[in-house]
Amino acid sequence: MRVLHAADLHLDSAFAGLDDEKAALFRQESRDTLRRMVDWGNDHAADVMLLAGDLFDSDSLFSQTARTLALALARFRGKVFLAPGNHDFYAAGSSYDAVDWPENVHIFTARTPQTVLLPELNASVTGAAFTAAEEWQPFDGAAFSGGDAPIRLGILHGEVTRGESKYRAIAPSEIKKTDLTYLALGHVHRCGGVQWAGKTAYAYSGCLPGRGFDETGDKGFLFGEVTPEGVDMEFVPFALRRYQSVTADITEREPAEAVRQALEPDCGQDICRVLLTGARREELSLAALQAELAGLCAALELTDETYPEEDIWARCGEDSLRGLFLQELRERYDAAEEAEKDGILRAARFGLAALENRDL
């Protein structure tokens, strides 16, 4: 059977680094992401969609959000299973309780595991919900078995750890006890690929999309084949935008070109933060640089940690270790071929940094 596993959409959340207008636009894009994902799942003949919690960032939603979710999922041709997480926990009167969900959607509403049989797919799906913002009771793998179905899927929001957690500690040893075929997890915002605990495969799909500079890179979902013989799930990059956070060294370079080279290609839709470092030849105007880079990405945040470039040979010939060091390199520089001079200048900078006990 074909399984699509997603989590942590955090619909109606704030977006870091954006003004109110762009944040509203990106929130609407997040809602549209759900519709696009349903269409993608239909186009790729997904049988089951597993949504492992934190679909909403909180229960304080814009009026259209929960309805948009329900309408989108109604268009999915397969079965949908939702396991509410710590941000969107299930409670009487919550957003999950206030919407008329389509018949193809099953929401797990209890802390204790429940199993739904899918005889037409020779499968079962076992899941549980957060019913409060915290869940200190650790995961009990023995209680999470999917019965005797040839394909036993699980869906859960929580933190894989060998210690304690207020977000439902899930020990790998407990995952092993489930004897599930595949356990779809939510809570961790980075996809780490499929892991194994005994015969049970488990994975975090990561968040979709990223919402801040601590959630950089491609975001998407997992999709693939789950059979009694094995699991083949792959990450599908799907977010329209990425957060990027990079450093651009402007030493002996034009600042705008340094920024362009530091960012990943095709960053026109991305939200980018760039830390400018190195030696600047002249005073740096961030406003002017922003204007020069207008249109490079959807949003650009610049921070200046550069320092004025000094005459590297200014203390050449001084009666000191520094002066003798520079004198020797200057003589080499003057006698060098043009292609060799950049290397000598770099050696001088590294040497001065070492003598002055500072970073470059």
Residues covered by each model-derived region:
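Alpha-helix termination/capping residues and helix-transition junctions
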Residues: 43, 77, 177, 266-268
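Conserved residues at the C-terminal ends of beta-strands
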Residues: 52, 186, 277
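Accessory, non-catalytic peripheral segments of nucleic-acid enzymes
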Residues: 228-360
